[in-house]
Amino acid sequence: MAIQLTEQDGRQSMEAHAASKGAEMRDKYGPDIGWGQLLNILKDRTLVRYPCEVAFDAAGLLEGECAHAQPNGDQPDEGFTIFIHPFFAAQPPHAVRLALYQLVVVNYGPFASSDDAEALGSAALGISTEEYYDSLCQIADQLT
């Protein structure tokens, strides 16, 4: 008899996979993920599926948005740019947290959720999802 998987099963599987990728990042480049480690993570195709670069440029952001991953072309193989608000260029620890959150878009595309992003980022940093979420809220509050 075939097992019928639900949408919830799919979401849980995606979140677990994102968390495992975050844990791999921490194992390989941690335990402290700083700016240099982030740049190495972005080059590592076992962790980040497609080429990815970071640009401190608000042109790719919506009003009030801290960061956003945008495809460089029609095909994922053309890579992605993670736009981070220039305000955070002088705050590497914040920029790292913002970039990690965006990596689920690079790895999973539009299927990724905020829960997936929090799972990956918190696992990479070795903190709880609540602590990661709270830190992102504090970072975002700096733009207001």
Outline where the language-model segments fall.
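Active-site scaffold of zinc-dependent metalloenzymes
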Residues: A55-P92
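Structured N-terminal alpha/beta-domain signature
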Residues: I41, H68-A69, Y101-Q102
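Active-site recognition of the HExxH zinc-binding catalytic motif
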Residues: P93-G109, A117
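A metal-dependent hydrolase signature that marks the N-terminal structural subdomain at the beginning
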Residues: M1-E65
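Acidic, metal/ion-handling microdomains and their immediate structural contexts
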Residues: D9, V105, G109, A123
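Short acidic, glycine/proline-enriched loop segments that cap or flank alpha-helices
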Residues: R26, F87-Q91, Y108-G109
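Post-HExxH zinc-binding segment in Zn-dependent metallohydrolases
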Residues: P110-T144
